[in-house]
Amino acid sequence: MNAPLDGLSVSSSSTGSLGSAAGAGGGGGAGLRLLSANVRQLHQALTALLSEAEREQFTHCLNAYHARRNVFDLVRTLRVLLDSPVKRRLLPMLRLVIPRSDQLLFDQYTAEGLYLPATTPYRQPAWGGPDSAGPGEVRLVSLRRAKAHEGLGFSIRGGSEHGVGIYVSLVEPGSLAEKEGLRVGDQILRVNDKSLARVTHAEAVKALKGSKKLVLSVYSAGRIPGGYVTNHIYTWVDPQGRSISPPSGLPQPHGGALRQQEGDRRSTLHLLQGGDEKKVNLVLGDGRSLGLTIRGGAEYGLGIYITGVDPGSEAEGSGLKVGDQILEVNGRSFLNILHDEAVRLLKSSRHLILTVKDVGRLPHARTTVDETKWIASSRIRETMANSAGFLGDLTTEGINKPGFYKGPAGSQVTLSSLGNQTRVLLEEQARHLLNEQEHATMAYYLDEYRGGSVSVEALVMALFKLLNTHAKFSLLSEVRGTISPQDLERFDHLVLRREIESMKARQPPGPGAGDTYSMVSYSDTGSSTGSHGTSTTVSSARNTLDLEETGEAVQGNINALPDVSVDDVRSTSQGLSSFKPLPRPPPLAQGNDLPLGQPRKLGREDLQPPSSMPSCSGTVFSAPQNRSPPAGTAPTPGTSSAQDLPSSPIYASVSPANPSSKRPLDAHLALVNQHPIGPFPRVQSPPHLKSPSAEATVAGGCLLPPSPSGHPDQTGTNQHFVMVEVHRPDSEPDVNEVRALPQTRTASTLSQLSDSGQTLSEDSGVDAGEAEASAPGRGRQSVSTKSRSSKELPRNERPTDGANKPPGLLEPTSTLVRVKKSAATLGIAIEGGANTRQPLPRIVTIQRGGSAHNCGQLKVGHVILEVNGLTLRGKEHREAARIIAEAFKTKDRDYIDFLVTEFNVML
């Protein structure tokens, strides 16, 4: 029963693998015979339902499960493999043969849908979704046009590029489609014996427009796809860094709903029985540190977990360990607490009474998933009735002036009198995708635009900043319905250009990439564009759609679910060569946020951070004078989303590792498309402030460069940060990868962060008193007082023209700093590079334990001019990071020479 599985044939491997599972979970005697019968039943079903290749994949999936015992990965893989209702009959059979200890998790994941959507070109909805029509529910609808250009009176939505079928999203009152019984929420399965199961939106339009007589096979699904909702899925590891199933009962955040009632959160966190909770009484003496590293917070939909315990600390002495969840501190619940608030409470008292639970696992990384949100057709009809109020009076076209509006979450183009429905649908979508602050901000700018105080360009740019995720961006399709007719063309041009730029940024360069983004006008389809807010320009005189399409390949990369009015209309091509980029206006307001995922040290030697650490600022369009948005509704400042960046930023966090230390989590740092989940500060005893002069005093006569002056860095919205993590070739930790630094967000918008390929490492190992400037007024920095033996050789820079020198800048001077390779890592983080507003790399973090920290000469704010004599002028961000990394790795010399200058000198 426990024989090796890899060498089994396909026909026998399923039985062998399942038999191994049965042996792992069963007892003896009759138990084994019962499980063997279950195995035989499953094996017969596998042979009947799956092809040979699919059985081989199924076997490989089971082998991976046996090796790692990760139920979450098992269900996620089966979600892709078992892609039809018939194949999913294997799930209850499989449950009977897996170990009993894993059956509860298996039931939870298959019942609650906690798995990624399939990555196949066509994916069925969730298990038993509306695409799986039951017997007897399919009906035929026959439609025949009396005239060549007569419309059928309904609109469709969906397509295989969106992972859903083709659905009827609108039926015109009094139209032929309504008379024949077509209803909103019907899924069109076939058109004249042609299946629409796996066709794109454009192909469905061609099929519906290709004949005067249509015989439609439809299934009453009762709902239509309504755009995307952002969900977050976490991967978990045990204290040794091995992948493990998530804790059962952990609530999964859905969309922006991160906060729950605390009583509900407590009742649903049945990770262990109540008796497994324990109280820990900690009294911190003078000079003693708490010695904890924590992770999580309510802004991430998580509790507070202990990810590190310092040897010899009070935490270790009291029995706290990695993998514990902190439930309560001094009577304050930690089940629904923000990360920073938890840090403040832990460091503000010298007597702590903690309630902890031995969960035995840690959240490791987060994946952001955009899932299809479904809208019930009954709700759509109610919305139309409430917004219009007189549906029965609109059976003729001449009663009211026709208007064109966009359907929910798609690029729907429909001739209708129900133009006032647009705002209602926009509000409906915004409630699902935006929090209250963002919702109020969007409403404010729309009101300002309608009042004439804000131009369409300013409105669009403000919305680009506000709708900063893949899911939120789909709201632009509804916003278009509120745009004045004279501004529609400009609105479409701006949105289309942004979409093309974002898609080019998301798709890696390769042969034929240019064809993907070519502007193609589908004059024969009548389909609207597949982009988010890009809609067609409609002439109501002849029902003519002037189509501007970006190709089917474009539709596969976006949120919007295009709708199109299935009318026989003519199309004229419009070239896009006249599109001109709108220059980004200068920021009118800037905000400072705490960068997520930056470890902050909570030591006893806290100083105000130097202002050389920039806050990532975002462009915010302010209203004219005497007009102000409602309180608390300013758009969330932040760096541009991943779509705006030409390339992903680099951030390789540095752990203060010794050559002999073990880092079991390194094997998990290659996860793709995952976000860090938050700052991981080290919590120490309450701070005892020392004077800055004493902190800056360096023993041994080792001079430190003067502190940077307090001039904030006016960085752009696309500021890149880089931390170079380089290990010596002869040292054990060989982590030379780079990882993306999470962009600046507030807690209220974290749930909508889109995935930009970021990977979470293990707490990044920043010690608790280390210099880490996160944001003005929020960061902490302490200056090392240890004496360092390093060389500081001043060297004159070439003369610079002093004319027009901004006030307050020092004369350009440079210093040669020699950094000995005294540790396994260099331990610096840099930002900037060519083609950015910081043309030369600047040090933003120096971590304890690294060679740079041991040197004592480099400091935060230094601008790096040269590395080992190689100039960094003209070097882009990634190239500069690569040069520094290679200089540290080379065995030719045991030091690195950095030519640095102060931040506030002219470069």
From Swiss-Prot:
MF terms in GO: identical protein binding
Residues that bear Phosphoserine: 685
GO process terms (BP): auditory receptor cell stereocilium organization; cerebellar Purkinje cell layer formation; detection of mechanical stimulus involved in sensory perception of sound; establishment of localization in cell; establishment of protein localization; inner ear receptor cell differentiation; inner ear receptor cell stereocilium organization; paranodal junction maintenance
Main subcellular localisation: cytoplasm
Keyword Ribonucleoprotein carried by entry: no
Region annotation (Disordered) ranges: 243-264, 502-540, 565-663, 684-717, 742-815
Biased composition (Low complexity): 521-540, 628-642
Cell location: Cytoplasm; Cell projection, Stereocilium; Cell projection, Growth cone; Photoreceptor inner segment
One Gene Ontology cellular component: ciliary basal body
Pfam families (UniProt xref): PDZ
Keywords in alphabetical order: Cell projection, Cytoplasm, Deafness, Hearing, Non-syndromic deafness, Phosphoprotein, Repeat, Retinitis pigmentosa, Synapse, Usher syndrome
Gene3D superfamilies cross-referenced by the UniProt entry: 1.20.1160.20, 2.30.42.10
Protein purpose: Involved in hearing and vision as member of the USH2 complex. Necessary for elongation and maintenance of inner and outer hair cell stereocilia in the organ of Corti in the inner ear. Involved in the maintenance of the hair bundle ankle region, which connects stereocilia in cochlear hair cells of the inner ear. In retina photoreceptors, required for the maintenance of periciliary membrane complex that seems to play a role in regulating intracellular protein transport.
Name of the protein this chain belongs to: Whirlin
